[in-house]
Amino acid sequence: MSAALLLATLLMTGLGQVAQKLTVEHWRLVAADGWTARLRSPWPWLALLALGLGLLCWLLLLQRVEVGSAYPMLALNFVLVTLAARFVFDEPVDRRHLAGLLLIVAGVALLGRSA
């Protein structure tokens, strides 16, 4: 159950970050149309929903796992969001980014073994 809650937290908060980026991309396109057009976009609402669900999953997870064990696992969001940046937004990911992501995964694996 804890692993499922952690995964749900990661996916919801990662989705929320992607939806925030989609929000600002859309807002650039409709900037001249004012706030009404901005608020009609589905992206800010998806961001709020995903981040809200992520918070709920996180709170449920904290009922089962110590925060010192659970919180470092959220670093995996750096990996998820970087992958989304590359494949959804076609942003460049260089070797330095990849090395950093590998270090994050190694750190999470190391901390996960001790938890």
UniProtKB/Swiss-Prot annotation:
Pathway(s) where this gene product acts: Bacterial outer membrane biogenesis; lipopolysaccharide biosynthesis
Species lineage: Bacteria, Pseudomonadati, Pseudomonadota, Gammaproteobacteria, Pseudomonadales
Subcellular location: Cell inner membrane
One Pfam family recorded for the sequence: EamA
Assembly and binders: Heterodimer of ArnE and ArnF.
Protein name: Probable 4-amino-4-deoxy-L-arabinose-phosphoundecaprenol flippase subunit ArnE
Gene Ontology molecular-function annotations: carbohydrate derivative transmembrane transporter activity; transmembrane transporter activity
Entry's family note: Belongs to the ArnE family.
Residue ranges of coiled coil: none
